[in-house]
C-alpha cells in the first residue's frame, strides 16, 4: 500500500510515500501539516506522473537541506517546491500542494533509518481510502502537466512524460 525506499546518496534517510483517494478532510490535513502535526509533504497526486518524480524531488530536497541551501523553510516544503518547473514558491504550493477541495493526497515522509516511523498514526489522520502508490499515474492530469512543464509534441514522441518532467525538475536551477 505504501512505498518505502532508501535514498541512494543519503543512506541514513528513508522516504515513505502513501497515496489516498476519496479524501474528505483535505482542509484539516493541510492545517495539520502547517501546524507541524503531520511531518510530511502533502502533494496533489494529479500533478504526479510517477512515484519516481517524488523520489527525485525528495532527494534534491535532502541534498539542499544537508548543505544548507534550501529555498523554503522546511524539508517538506522544499519537496513540494522541487516538483515545480519554476522558482516561484507560492506557485509551487498552489500547483503541487493540496487544496481544501482536493479529494486525493500523496503524502511523502522522510525519516532517519534509526527513527521509528509510525505510519499508522499518519494513516489514521486521513479520512479517505489508502491505495497503492503505484496507482498514482491513474490520478495524473496529463494535460495539466504537459502545459505546466511546457512539453512539446516532439518531446512526447521521443520520450516519456516522466522523462520530460524529471528533466525539467533537474534543470530548474540551471536554466
Swiss-Prot record:
Observed effect of gene inactivation: Embryos display primary microcephaly, leading to early lethality. Marked apoptosis is observed in the brain (telencephalon). Fishes do not show a renal phenotype, possibly as a result of early lethality.
Function description: Component of the EKC/KEOPS complex that is required for the formation of a threonylcarbamoyl group on adenosine at position 37 (t(6)A37) in tRNAs that read codons beginning with adenine. The complex is probably involved in the transfer of the threonylcarbamoyl moiety of threonylcarbamoyl-AMP (TC-AMP) to the N6 group of A37. Tprkb acts as an allosteric effector that regulates the t(6)A activity of the complex.
Main localization, broad class: cytoplasm
Full protein name: EKC/KEOPS complex subunit TPRKB
Region forming the signal peptide: none
GO biological process: tRNA threonylcarbamoyladenosine modification
Lineage: Eukaryota, Metazoa, Chordata, Craniata, Vertebrata
Subunit comment: Component of the EKC/KEOPS complex.
GO CC annotations on file: cytoplasm; cytosol; EKC/KEOPS complex; nucleus
UniProt cross-references to Gene3D superfamilies, sorted A to Z: CGI121/TPRKB
Keywords in alphabetical order: Cytoplasm, Nucleus, tRNA processing
Protein location: Cytoplasm, Cytosol; Nucleus
InterPro entries reported in the protein's UniProt record: CGI121/TPRKB, CGI121/TPRKB_sf
Domain of life: Eukaryota
Pfam families membership: CGI-121
Family of the protein in this entry: Belongs to the CGI121/TPRKB family.
Amino acid at each position: 500500500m505504501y512505498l518505502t525506499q532508501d535514498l541512494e546518496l543519503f543512506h541514513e534517510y528513508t522516504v515513505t510515500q502513501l497515496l489516498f483517494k476519496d479524501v474528505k478532510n483535505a482542509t484539516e490535513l493541510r492545517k495539520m501539516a502547517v501546524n507541524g502535526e503531520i511531518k510530511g509533504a502533502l502533494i496533489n497526486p494529479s500533478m504526479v506522473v510517477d512515484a519516481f518524480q517524488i523520489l527525485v524531488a525528495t532527494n534534491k530536497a535532502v541534498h539542499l537541506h544537508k548543505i544548507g541551501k534550501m529555498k523554503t523553510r522546511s524539508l517538506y516544503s522544499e519537496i513540494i517546491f522541487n516538483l515545480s518547473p519554476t522558482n516561484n514558491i507560492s506557485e509551487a504550493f498552489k500547483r503541487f500542494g493540496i487544496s481544501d477541495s482536493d479529494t486525493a493526497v500523496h503524502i511523502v515522509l522522510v525519516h532517519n533509518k534509526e527513527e521509528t516511523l509510525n505510519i499508522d498514526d499518519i494513516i489514521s489522520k486521513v479520512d479517505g481510502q489508502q491505495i497503492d502508490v503505484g496507482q498514482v499515474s491513474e490520478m495524473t492530469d496529463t494535460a495539466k502537466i504537459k502545459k505546466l512543464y511546457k512539453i512539446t509534441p516532439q518531446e512526447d514522441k521521443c520520450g516519456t512524460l516522466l522523462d520530460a518532467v524529471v528533466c525539467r525538475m533537474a534543470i530548474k536551477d540551471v536554466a
